[in-house]
């Protein structure tokens, strides 16, 4: 409508946010403008929730917000298609993942288990827009996406985050998988 080339419009949009604007383009899985195929994948018994490339692409991918996105979009906000139950989401983010990595001593709120606990305000949960920060060695860039709605994060009985602010407590330690052996059968 402005008589501008698409690239000109994109560049104009990028400079509006003091150089901090980003464009997002899904690389796949959204060709039909529906997330129904992703829901089917997420529900498959051999699929684990999680994303990581060990930080190799932290300047172009902000995937640390994945748990918050799963809870807010799939568990609360989705309007075009069925949601996932919150119980399924929590199990998938906790015990299912722990067991897949042989960590049978965690992932449950049970006596004798190691429990890291997030106290959340589910209705207040949301993700901020991704932003680039330059705090890596030699001024390297990484993308971060801050969440809201996490009231407390407790590790080993100590509060490590209070309303999104780190308390300075560092009770964590190196995690190794359990020596416990279990038979694993893939579901088809």
Predicted segments, located by residue:
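His/Asp/Glu-enriched, well-ordered alpha-helical/loop segment
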Residues: 1-16, 22, 33-126
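C-terminal cap of metal-dependent C-N hydrolases
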Residues: 40-47, 52, 119-171
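Short C-terminal domain-edge/linker segments immediately following a structured domain
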Residues: 79-83, 147-156, 183-186
């Amino acid at each position: 409508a402005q008589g501008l080339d698409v690239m000109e419009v994109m560049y104009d949009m990028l400079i509006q946010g003091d150089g901090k604007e980003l464009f997002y383009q899904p690389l796949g899985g959204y060709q039909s403008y529906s997330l129904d195929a992703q829901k089917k994948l997420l529900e498959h018994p051999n699929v684990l929730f999680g994303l990581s490339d060990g930080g190799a692409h932290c300047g172009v991918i902000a995937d640390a917000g994945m748990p918050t996105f799963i809870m807010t979009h799939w568990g609360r906000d989705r309007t075009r298609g069925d949601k996932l139950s919150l119980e399924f989401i929590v199990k998938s983010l906790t015990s299912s993942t722990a067991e897949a990595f042989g960590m049978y001593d965690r992932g449950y709120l049970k006596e004798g288990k190691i429990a890291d606990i997030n106290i959340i305000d589910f209705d207040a949960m949301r993700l901020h827009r991704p932003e680039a920060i330059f705090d890596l060695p030699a001024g390297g860039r990484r993308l971060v996406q801050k969440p809201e709605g996490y009231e407390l994060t407790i590790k080993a009985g100590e509060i490590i985050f209070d309303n999104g602010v780190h308390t300075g407590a560092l009770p964590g330690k190196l995690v190794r998988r359990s020596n416990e052996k279990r038979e694993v059968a893939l579901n088809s």
